[in-house]
Amino acid sequence: MKTFSAKAHEVTREWYVIDATDKVLGRVASEVARRLRGKHKPEFTPHVDTGDFIIIINASKLKVTGNKTLDKKYYRHSGYPGGIYETTFGKMQERFPGRALEKAVKGMLPKGPLGYAMIKKLKVYAEATHPHSAQQPKALEI
Protein backbone atom coordinates (compact mmCIF):
# COMPACT_ATOMS: atom_id res chain seq x y z
CA MET A 1 0.00 0.00 0.00
CA LYS A 2 1.36 3.40 -1.01
CA THR A 3 1.44 6.44 1.24
CA PHE A 4 -1.20 8.97 0.22
CA SER A 5 0.00 12.45 -0.71
CA ALA A 6 -2.51 15.19 -1.49
CA LYS A 7 -2.06 17.24 -4.65
CA ALA A 8 -2.67 20.98 -4.49
CA HIS A 9 -5.15 20.96 -7.40
CA GLU A 10 -7.19 18.07 -5.92
CA VAL A 11 -7.88 19.73 -2.56
CA THR A 12 -11.51 20.74 -1.92
CA ARG A 13 -11.82 23.72 0.38
CA GLU A 14 -14.89 24.51 2.46
CA TRP A 15 -15.88 27.90 3.88
CA TYR A 16 -16.70 28.14 7.59
CA VAL A 17 -17.93 31.04 9.70
CA ILE A 18 -17.14 31.29 13.42
CA ASP A 19 -18.89 33.65 15.82
CA ALA A 20 -16.23 34.80 18.31
CA THR A 21 -18.67 36.40 20.76
CA ASP A 22 -17.51 35.67 24.34
CA LYS A 23 -15.01 33.04 23.14
CA VAL A 24 -11.48 32.79 24.58
CA LEU A 25 -8.72 34.05 22.26
CA GLY A 26 -6.35 31.07 22.48
CA ARG A 27 -9.04 28.41 22.13
CA VAL A 28 -10.43 30.02 18.99
CA ALA A 29 -6.95 30.64 17.56
CA SER A 30 -5.75 27.05 18.01
CA GLU A 31 -8.84 25.56 16.34
CA VAL A 32 -8.66 28.09 13.49
CA ALA A 33 -4.95 27.37 12.92
CA ARG A 34 -5.70 23.63 12.86
CA ARG A 35 -8.42 24.08 10.24
CA LEU A 36 -6.42 26.56 8.12
CA ARG A 37 -3.64 23.99 8.00
CA GLY A 38 -6.01 21.12 7.15
CA LYS A 39 -5.09 18.85 10.07
CA HIS A 40 -8.75 17.97 10.64
CA LYS A 41 -8.91 16.22 7.24
CA PRO A 42 -7.85 12.61 6.63
CA GLU A 43 -5.97 13.68 3.47
CA PHE A 44 -3.70 16.11 5.42
CA THR A 45 -0.25 16.37 3.88
CA PRO A 46 2.35 18.55 5.66
CA HIS A 47 3.85 20.10 2.52
CA VAL A 48 0.52 20.88 0.79
CA ASP A 49 -2.01 23.53 1.79
CA THR A 50 -5.09 21.35 2.43
CA GLY A 51 -6.90 23.75 4.77
CA ASP A 52 -10.27 25.47 4.57
CA PHE A 53 -11.32 29.11 4.48
CA ILE A 54 -12.33 30.55 7.86
CA ILE A 55 -14.44 33.67 8.42
CA ILE A 56 -14.50 35.04 11.97
CA ILE A 57 -17.23 37.51 12.91
CA ASN A 58 -17.64 39.57 16.10
CA ALA A 59 -13.88 39.61 16.71
CA SER A 60 -14.33 42.75 18.82
CA LYS A 61 -16.23 40.65 21.42
CA LEU A 62 -13.37 38.18 21.91
CA LYS A 63 -12.31 37.54 25.51
CA VAL A 64 -9.11 36.63 27.35
CA THR A 65 -8.97 34.97 30.76
CA GLY A 66 -7.53 36.42 33.93
CA ASN A 67 -5.97 39.87 33.88
CA LYS A 68 -4.59 39.56 30.33
CA THR A 69 -6.64 42.50 29.06
CA LEU A 70 -4.15 44.76 30.84
CA ASP A 71 -1.15 42.44 31.25
CA LYS A 72 -0.79 40.88 27.77
CA LYS A 73 1.55 43.03 25.73
CA TYR A 74 2.27 43.19 22.01
CA TYR A 75 5.57 44.61 20.79
CA ARG A 76 6.68 46.08 17.47
CA HIS A 77 9.79 47.92 16.41
CA SER A 78 10.24 50.75 13.92
CA GLY A 79 13.78 49.71 13.04
CA TYR A 80 15.32 52.80 14.57
CA PRO A 81 17.29 52.83 17.85
CA GLY A 82 14.86 53.10 20.74
CA GLY A 83 11.92 52.60 18.40
CA ILE A 84 10.10 49.86 20.30
CA TYR A 85 6.35 50.19 20.77
CA GLU A 86 4.25 48.36 23.33
CA THR A 87 0.47 47.85 23.28
CA THR A 88 -1.82 45.95 25.64
CA PHE A 89 -4.50 43.53 24.48
CA GLY A 90 -7.25 45.91 25.59
CA LYS A 91 -5.89 48.87 23.61
CA MET A 92 -5.32 46.71 20.54
CA GLN A 93 -8.92 45.43 20.69
CA GLU A 94 -10.18 49.03 20.93
CA ARG A 95 -8.11 50.32 18.02
CA PHE A 96 -7.89 47.26 15.75
CA PRO A 97 -10.47 44.63 16.73
CA GLY A 98 -9.39 41.26 15.38
CA ARG A 99 -5.69 42.00 15.01
CA ALA A 100 -4.87 40.15 18.24
CA LEU A 101 -6.65 37.08 16.86
CA GLU A 102 -4.80 37.36 13.53
CA LYS A 103 -1.45 37.58 15.35
CA ALA A 104 -2.33 34.59 17.56
CA VAL A 105 -3.31 32.42 14.59
CA LYS A 106 -0.30 33.53 12.52
CA GLY A 107 2.03 32.50 15.34
CA MET A 108 0.51 29.00 15.31
CA LEU A 109 1.00 28.44 11.57
CA PRO A 110 4.22 27.33 9.82
CA LYS A 111 6.68 30.03 8.88
CA GLY A 112 7.55 30.34 5.19
CA PRO A 113 5.64 30.39 1.89
CA LEU A 114 3.15 27.68 2.91
CA GLY A 115 2.24 29.47 6.15
CA TYR A 116 1.84 32.77 4.31
CA ALA A 117 -0.61 31.10 1.91
CA MET A 118 -2.54 29.62 4.85
CA ILE A 119 -2.99 32.93 6.69
CA LYS A 120 -4.52 34.46 3.54
CA LYS A 121 -7.48 32.08 3.96
CA LEU A 122 -8.39 33.72 7.29
CA LYS A 123 -10.95 36.56 7.12
CA VAL A 124 -11.58 38.46 10.38
CA TYR A 125 -14.39 40.99 10.87
CA ALA A 126 -15.12 43.06 13.99
CA GLU A 127 -18.89 43.11 13.43
CA ALA A 128 -21.52 40.45 12.74
CA THR A 129 -21.61 41.02 8.97
CA HIS A 130 -19.20 39.75 6.33
CA PRO A 131 -19.07 40.03 2.51
CA HIS A 132 -18.64 36.30 1.86
CA SER A 133 -22.27 35.16 1.74
CA ALA A 134 -21.81 34.06 -1.91
CA GLN A 135 -19.47 31.30 -0.70
CA GLN A 136 -22.28 29.90 1.52
CA PRO A 137 -20.13 29.37 4.62
CA LYS A 138 -21.18 26.74 7.15
CA ALA A 139 -21.46 27.73 10.81
CA LEU A 140 -18.70 26.20 12.94
CA GLU A 141 -19.11 26.02 16.72
CA ILE A 142 -16.00 26.06 18.90
UniProtKB/Swiss-Prot annotation:
InterPro entries hit by this protein: Ribosomal_uL13, Ribosomal_uL13_bac-type, Ribosomal_uL13_sf
Keywords, sorted A to Z: Ribonucleoprotein, Ribosomal protein
A Pfam cross-reference name: Ribosomal_L13
Disulfide bonds: none
Record-linked SUPFAM superfamilies: Ribosomal protein L13 (SSF52161)
GO cellular component, one term: cytosolic large ribosomal subunit
GO molecular function terms noted in the UniProt entry: mRNA binding; structural constituent of ribosome
Ribosomal protein in keyword set: yes
An annotated GO BP: negative regulation of translation
Superkingdom of this protein's organism: Bacteria
Function as written in the Swiss-Prot or TrEMBL entry: This protein is one of the early assembly proteins of the 50S ribosomal subunit, although it is not seen to bind rRNA by itself. It is important during the early stages of 50S assembly.
Assembly mode: Part of the 50S ribosomal subunit.
Entry's family note: Belongs to the universal ribosomal protein uL13 family.
Name of this protein: Large ribosomal subunit protein uL13
Species of origin: Burkholderia vietnamiensis (strain G4 / LMG 22486)
Gene (name only): rplM
